[in-house]
Amino acid sequence: MDKLKKVLSGQDTEDRSGLSEVVEASSLSWSTRIKGFIACFAIGILCSLLGTVLLWVPRKGLHLFAVFYTFGNIASIGSTIFLMGPVKQLKRMFEPTRLIATIMVLLCFALTLCSAFWWHNKGLALIFCILQSLALTWYSLSFIPFARDAVKKCFAVCLA
């Protein structure tokens, strides 16, 4: 069906390079992409929840929490690669409108792990996990048109 759409829209050319044939042959079907997205997102949610439960394990709880919670959030973001593809996802992550949000998310990932493994500070790890969640929310809102503007206005009204 996609090939028919390309031919009808004039996008299909007869001179196809070997690379374009490899890319087309290795691309996933839409149903496989949806299944991959759901599986990766579910793994991310489960890891985050497991990390929250493991926080209360004596001695190693903080390390387990930081690893599972951060890995869960990375898996949740990574799940969208199935929908968009890796190159398009990376391009969209670093667009000017969401560059700061992307940097904050990546920084919070790193700081959460640093506070657990190098600094051994539970309070700081929890703060960075909260910031991680807020940064991910802000990053996610950047994909919904005018959502961040609406959130800003709501907070401005609430604080005024």
Curated annotation (Swiss-Prot):
Q: What is its main location?
A: membrane
Topology within the bilayer: Multi-pass membrane protein
Alphabetized Pfam families for the sequence: Got1 (PF04178)
- Would the keyword S-adenosyl-L-methionine be found if you checked this record's keyword annotation? no
| Leader peptide range in chain numbering | none
Lumenal topological domain ranges are 58-63, 120-123
**What does the sequence similarity comment in the record state about its family?**
Belongs to the SFT2 family.
Annotated function: May be involved in fusion of retrograde transport vesicles derived from an endocytic compartment with the Golgi complex.
Q: What is the protein name stated in its UniProt record?
A: Vesicle transport protein SFT2B
